[in-house]
Regions:
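Buried hydrophobic packing segments
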Residues: 3, 27, 31, 48-52, ...
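Short beta-strand-centered segment that lines the nucleotide-binding/catalytic pocket of NTP-utilizing
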Residues: 36-48
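A conserved, hydrophobic alpha-helical segment in the catalytic core
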Residues: 75-87, 158-188
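Short, basic phosphate-binding NTP loop
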Residues: 1-13, 24-27, 34
Length: 188
C-alpha cells in the first residue's frame, strides 16, 4: 500500500501458491527484450521501496505473497494473476479459506478495465470468483494450449507440468501487452 501511494504505474502482479518467482522472472526477461522500462519487485527479493529512477512508463512486475496481500487496502494492479491455490501458510492465516481471501484481495482491488488471469478449470479459484465482486476482465489460462507454443523448444526445464502452467500465464499476459511470441521463445 505504501508503494501504491507513491507510484501509480502499471503493475503486473503475480500471486499463487507455486510458480510466482519463475513466472515473474520470465515476464521480466520478456519485457526487457521488448525494451520496456521494467522493474522486478516484491517477494522475489527486490524491495519495492528501493526502486530508483522510476518514470511514468516504468512497469512493475510484482511478486505478491499472501502475507503482503493480507493487509493490502489500496494497492491496485492493472494486470493480476492468481496461478494456483493449495493449502499453504495455514499457521499464519489459520484456515485455507483465509489464505484464499488474502490472495483474492489482488483481484478484488482491481477496477473495471483491469485484467485478471486465472487458471482455467481450477475449482477453488472458480468458486471464489463466483462469490466475489470482481470488476476486472477475467482471462482463463489453459496450460493445455501451451504445447503448440512449446513445439521445437529444446529447454527441458520448461517442459514440466508446473512450468507449462507458468509459461501459459506468461503467454496470456504477453498477448495482452502485444508482445511478439517469438520474443518469448527467445527468452525461453
Amino acid at each position: 500500500d505504501i508503494f501504491y501511494s507513491f507510484y501509480k504505474n502499471d503493475c503486473i502482479t503475480i500471486t499463487g501458491t507455486n510458480g510466482k518467482s519463475t513466472t515473474c522472472q520470465i515476464l521480466y526477461e520478456v519485457l526487457l527484450k521488448q525494451k520496456f522500462d521494467v522493474r522486478l519487485v516484491g517477494n522475489i527479493g527486490n524491495p519495492i521501496l528501493s526502486v530508483k529512477k522510476v518514470k511514468k512508463k516504468t512497469i512493475f512486475i510484482v511478486e505478491a505473497s499472501s502475507y503482503q496481500l493480507e493487509y493490502s487496502k489500496i494497492f491496485r494492479s492493472k494486470y493480476a494473476a492468481i496461478l494456483n491455490l493449495t493449502p499453504d501458510h495455514i499457521e499464519r492465516h489459520k484456515t485455507f479459506n483465509n489464505y484464499i481471501k488474502a490472495k483474492f484481495k489482488l483481484l478484488k482491488n482491481q477496477l473495471k478495465g483491469h485484467l485478471a488471469f486465472i487458471k482455467k478449470n481450477d475449482l477453488i479459484i472458480q468458486r471464489e470468483i463466483k462469490s466475489s465482486r470482481i470488476r476486472s476482465k477475467i482471462t482463463e489460462v489453459d496450460k493445455n494450449k501451451i504445447d503448440i507454443f512449446l513445439k521445437n523448444i529444446d529447454n527441458n526445464y520448461f517442459l514440466t507440468e508446473t512450468n507449462k502452467e507458468n509459461l501459459s500465464f506468461v503467454l496470456a499476459i504477453s498477448k495482452k501487452l502485444n508482445i511478439q511470441t517469438n520474443l518469448l521463445k527467445k527468452v525461453i
